[in-house]
């Protein structure tokens, strides 16, 4: 189904070996997480496809939500994020994504009508 994400993290920034930072923290950036509500799912964004378990404790991963949430935070714009979980980020991710994409599109149409 469709889930609402309210917590956003950058999952692929890794400066741990250079500085005393956690995975996902960007050096010299004061915004390393965006939490709009404790209710809802956590989402880790990065520029790589995920096909195995990652080190961060996240509900789901994508490639764009953190950037959108951060721009909205910086500009004072309310941000709502709904995601359709298309696959389990495993060896079957590609075939699962293809199979589930049409289902997700239909569910998003229903969700948008009910907002």
Positions of the model-derived regions?
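Glycine-rich phosphate- or other oxyanion-binding loops that anchor nucleotides, phosphorylated ligands
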Residues: 1-115
């Amino acid at each position: 189904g469709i889930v609402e994400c309210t917590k956003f993290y950058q999952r692929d920034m890794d400066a741990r070996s250079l500085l005393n930072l956690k995975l996902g923290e960007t050096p010299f950036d004061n915004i390393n997480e965006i939490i709009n509500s404790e209710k809802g799912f956590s989402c880790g964004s990065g520029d790589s496809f995920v096909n195995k378990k990652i080190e961060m404790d996240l509900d789901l991963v994508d490639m764009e939500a953190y950037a959108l949430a951060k721009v909205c935070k910086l500009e004072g714009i309310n941000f709502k994020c709904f995601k359709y979980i298309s696959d389990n980020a495993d060896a079957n991710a590609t075939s699962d994504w293809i199979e589930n994409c049409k289902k997700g599109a239909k569910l998003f149409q229903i969700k948008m009508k009910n907002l």
